[in-house]
Amino acid sequence: MAKYQTNKTKRAVYNTLRCIGVMLFGQNRFKQPKFLENAAQKDKYEVWLGMIDEGKINEVENELIEETEQRRPDMHPSESEKMAMLEVALQIYKYINDKDDAFLERSSYSREEVEEGILSVMHILHIDTDMICRLLV
């Protein structure tokens, strides 16, 4: 993929993340997730970041999707649990998106997969992805 195209995709993913953050959390920047309230949660998040740094992006994504599935609306999570999970997912995908193209290629991952992952998490949590997609067009 041409460098221009990958930079354009990287910006598009970042804009998706920013837009979702503003709409759902009222913040324009991503900060340390509020979900890091206890040591176990913080440890899991830090393990995921370490795995990403090792190139194990697909493994992290699988675990993230599994965690998200446990907070599906039919599992009756609280609204704050659902939003905390979304915030975690957005942070993870932002971290992945911040990696350079060569790293992503070595890790068998693409920026398109970042965007697909964001939309998948939102779909699992029953958050209206159509509204987000319309805003980004």
Q: Model-predicted segments: where are they?
A:
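Non-catalytic amphipathic alpha-helical adaptor/oligomerization segments
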Residues: A2-V137
